[in-house]
Amino acid sequence: FVLGRLIMSLDKPYLDVPGTTIFDAEQSRKGYHLNQFCMSLMTAANRERFKADERVYLDEWAMTEEQKLAVLARDLNRCIALGGNIYLLAKIGATDGKSFQQMAGSMTGMTEEEYRNMMIAGGRSVEGNRVVGEDGDAQAHRQPQGSAHAASQPKASA
């Protein structure tokens, strides 16, 4: 019976939704220390310590090296993949003086204005975005992957 529940918990049909990471129990466990770090930024003294030396402050947390590097790069898509909760990751943006709208835009490869206009117009089209493998704009191959991704992209020829 316990094994049956374990197997059911591994069956995640929602993993086929492109551009979406569901913050479930597995993600929560994976990102526990990352999310605790984010919560610490709710205190002014901790924000100041983080801004004074980000790496030193991050090293006080039992986060994985990959999580720390994602925070340092402000690669929020990677932070989410590593268990970060978007509502807690917003504390990093607030510490940087960014609005949630600016953060969300950066995660989609849009400017703040483009993101705002898309949301006002009703969000992304479901066409091409219903399941992984289609060719819509929410598909993983069309998403920015942070500064490391941008740096690895070939430069357009003149």
Segments predicted by a language model, with ranges:
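Short, Lys/Arg-enriched N-terminal segments with co-localized hydrophobic residues
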Residues: 1-7
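Charged, low-complexity intrinsically disordered segments
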Residues: 7-158
